[in-house]
Design a protein with these regions (language model features):
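Conserved GNAT acetyl-CoA-binding A-motif
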Residues: 82-95
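Conserved glycine-rich acetyl-CoA-binding loop
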Residues: 43, 59-77, 94-102, 106-107
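Short secondary-structure capping/turn micro-motifs that flank functional sites
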Residues: 16, 46, 99, 120-121
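Terminal substrate-recognition subdomain of acyl/acetyltransferases
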Residues: 129-145
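Conserved catalytic-core motifs of GNAT/GCN5-like acyltransferases
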Residues: 90-93, 105, 110-133
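Acetyl-CoA-dependent GNAT
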Residues: 1-65, 76-78, 82, 138-140
Length: 145
């Protein structure tokens, strides 16, 4: 949520209450999304979603106090395994989210386009310019010549 506070207008962040987010996740489940919670010692500390219809991985979050423990990598690897029908799953990430960008690149994802541009000059919900990039998983090298 800190990333949202850094780039989104306060009114936009405040509108994303727990109740509003539950409604949004319920709507997305109706569109083919499945969500998985990660817990450590029975305490939820991460979430990831996958869409079997499109091969998209989304809603990958790790609580601030749980970061740096490999949970994000575990969740991403889990999500990839949940999408065997999509050899090149994809996700979207803000280019200003450097921590997530580093993880995704280490896990074999590479830029494959821009989905949105958030520009405060044209978008009242944005407080700073950033791009939402599409990253797609690269196929492993086959090793054949």
């Amino acid at each position: 949520m800190q990333m949202c506070r850094d780039i989104c207008a306060p009114a936009y962040v405040e509108a994303h209450t727990p109740a509003a987010m539950r409604e949004e996740l319920a709507r997305q489940r109706g569109e083919g999304w499945a969500f998985y919670l990660h817990s450590t010692a029975d305490v939820p500390d991460g979430l990831v979603g996958v869409c079997h219809k499109t091969g998209e991985i989304g809603h990958l979050f790790v609580k601030t106090e749980a970061r740096g423990q490999g949970i994000g990598a575990k969740l991403l690897e889990f999500a990839i395994k949940k999408l065997p029908e999509h050899p090149r799953p994809w996700l979207a990430v803000l280019d200003c989210n450097t921590g997530a960008m580093g993880l995704y690149r280490r896990m074999g994802f590479a830029p494959d386009g821009v989905r949105n541009v958030f520009d405060p000059a044209t978008d009242p919900n944005s407080t700073r310019l950033c791009r939402e990039l599409i990253l797609r998983r690269c196929l492993p090298e086959s090793g054949t010549r």
